[in-house]
Regions:
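A short acidic, Gly/Pro-enriched loop at the edge of an enzyme's catalytic core
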Residues: 77-86
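Conserved SAM-binding strand-loop segment of SAM-dependent methyltransferases
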Residues: 61-73
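Conserved SAM/SAH-binding beta-strand->alpha-helix loop
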Residues: 47-49
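S-adenosyl-L-methionine
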Residues: 1-15
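A short glycine-rich, Lys/Arg-flanked "PGG" loop and its adjoining helix->strand segment in the class I
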Residues: 99-110
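Conserved beta-strand signature within the Rossmann-like core of class I S-adenosyl-L-methionine
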Residues: 109-119
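A short SAM/SAH-binding and catalytic strip from SAM-dependent methyltransferases
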Residues: 85-98
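Conserved SAM-binding motif I beta-strand of class I
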Residues: 40-45
């Protein structure tokens, strides 16, 4: 499992240590990368199978990753989180109204890192319009400082990445 290359490139924006929330973590490739760097990671996903794989690899390397099964479509789910030094969302389109709740869980000077599809790729029929990250989705975090925004391509896939600072 290889972590997201742009996360590695962007780690300079993150606090040097602390607690990070990985939303919709899947198998946890980014969680594992961050834990290897010494961060305390809280990883959330709706798939028990994916979290079991993440737990297996984390235990194998004795990494500090807390996993949680959760449905992000449940209205109150995000209200019961810790406070974090950074939150990452990779290849998952969060409902726009949830960003304001999420920002309450980022510590002062903390980071929100969002990476997602900018357009539907021609080589992956599983990605639909519902998966595309839109500027208007982020309207509730406009008052925070946008540290960096980048559009990039890997093969036929185009992505957009945002780094917000609270």
């Amino acid at each position: 499992m290889r972590h997201e290359k742009c996360l590695e490139e962007d780690i300079k924006y993150f606090p040097r240590k602390g607690k990070i929330l990985d939303i919709a973590c899947g198998d946890g490739r980014n969680s594992i990368y961050l834990a290897r760097l010494g961060y305390v990671v809280h990883a959330i996903d709706f798939s028990e199978e994916a979290l079991n794989r993440l737990n297996y690899f984390a235990e194998k390397e004795n990494l500090n990753i807390e996993t949680q099964l959760g449905d992000l479509s449940e209205n109150n789910f995000l209200n019961n989180l810790y406070n974090y030094d950074a939150i990452i969302i990779n290849h998952y389109r969060l409902r726009p109204e949830l960003y304001s709740i999420l920002m309450k869980h980022i510590k002062e000077n903390g980071v929100l890192w969002i990476n997602g599809f900018k357009e539907i790729p021609s080589d992956n029929p599983n990605i639909t319009e519902l998966d595309i990250l839109r500027e208007e989705d982020l309207i509730d975090i406009e008052n925070y400082h946008l540290e960096n925004k980048k559009t990039y391509s890997i093969g036929e896939r185009t992505f957009i990445r945002y780094i917000w600072r609270k």
